Amino acid sequence: LITVNSGVWLDHQQWLDLSAVKEVRSLVVCLDEVSPLSTDLVELVRAGVMGVDNIPWIVSMHDLMVISEINEDPALFLLYLRCRTDPSVAFRLASSDELDFYMRFLMGLLVEDLEVHHRLSARPPDLSPDDGSGVHGGFGHRRPAQQLLSHTDDLDAWVYFEQGHSEVAVEKPAFHFPEQLQNLVAKIKRQEIAGWLRASADLYGLQQDQQRQLVNMLTKLPALAKRS
């Protein structure tokens, strides 16, 4: 409705104009644990259940609640949605636990995974049904999904401490990001200029070498300003 009609009708025939929305992401929240389904979307695409253009993020209520307790920035959540619904991640990485993906994201590795897959993939993943012949049409060669290792040890320790099951104090997991860039994102957020949410997510999504370059540039700005 948002992408096609640029809005929706509310009660009493009131039109909600959403033409200013620039980015739309689909979420499917389930009461039951759905990790095998949510982390292996490629089979749903191959079966024709969903298309590749708007892959939803399928998550259980429990995992979403855990993520909401950790995440404190809407821009970070938007970046995570971008990563989890990108075909390069959805089709080439697999795990039985959604929180493995989220912890990998907090470590900055999921963003790196996304860049690596985009850079190395000359062709998109093969989404054609398997007819048993070993020949697939139109979508490139099939590649087995990379199975993620468990990344939830620190998360488990924090949850146990928060719930009173452990006396060992553990810091809440946080996104790895340079302090200078954190301050820049915070300033953009405070000003609430048009596009601040997407711009902040773009900054969070910078590769490590890009982060270093930007930090270096920000460090030099005061001296350059004095010269001018």
Q: Which ranges hold each PLM region?
A:
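Short acidic loop-to-beta-strand element that houses the catalytic metal-binding Asp/Glu
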Residues: 1-2, 228
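Acidic, metal/cofactor-coordinating or nucleic-acid-engaging core segments within structured domains
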Residues: 3-15
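A general structural signal for short secondary-structure junctions and capping/turn motifs
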Residues: 15-21
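Extended hydrophobic secondary-structure segments that form protein cores and membrane-embedded regions
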Residues: 23-31
